[in-house]
Amino acid sequence: MMTSNSLYKSINATTMRLILSCMVLVLLSITASAQEDPPRPLQVSTFQNLSFGAIIQGTTGGKIIIDPEGSRSVTGDIIPVNMGYSYYPAIFEIRALPGALINIVNGPDVLLNGNNGGTLLLHIGNSIPNSPFINTRNPASPIQVRIGGTLTVGNSIANPAGNYIGYFSVTFA
């Protein structure tokens, strides 16, 4: 036979178990949410440098243009020649997560210094693909970005024959 005191304790214990069971069920039904991982940064590497090839400059100079597809054209009295020097656009390989929006920002015009004196002005041109673009490849398969440029050449006194070298910047974001 149960006394009222032991009945009270039994009901109290049963109620506590029921409350604890409900709390456990409530806690199990709560879904945790957190902020997603930040996107991985782009990985960019130079696959090929920009090259304008060989030319013969005239008396007034002009411009040499390399488009992103690799074609070369000239203005003024510049004569394009091959002479074993190839011309081609710069190619960068980008690895990014699929769906990443990639912007290309060209740096400022730069001066290329000649080994026999003189400087040439380099303007970075358009790209293929055009900016901005969405990466559709996985990081194991890089996308190639081709960038052309325009080189301004003066007369032979201002720009004596020789090799001209310099560095330009392009930002991928």
Can you describe what each PLM-predicted range is?
Residues 16-24:
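Sec-dependent signal peptide recognition
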Residues 9-13, 82, 112:
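Short N-terminal leader segment in a subset of presequences, especially plant chloroplast
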Residues 1-16:
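N-terminal secretory signal peptides that target proteins for export/translocation
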Residues 29-31:
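N-terminal signal peptide c-region/cleavage motif recognized by signal peptidases
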Residues 98, 106-132:
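Surface-exposed binding patches on compact interaction domains or structured appendages
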Residues 6, 44, 104-105, 121-123:
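Generic hydrophobic, helix-prone segments enriched in Leu/Val/Ile
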Residues 33-105, 109-111, 135-173:
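N-terminal small/polar-rich segments of proteins
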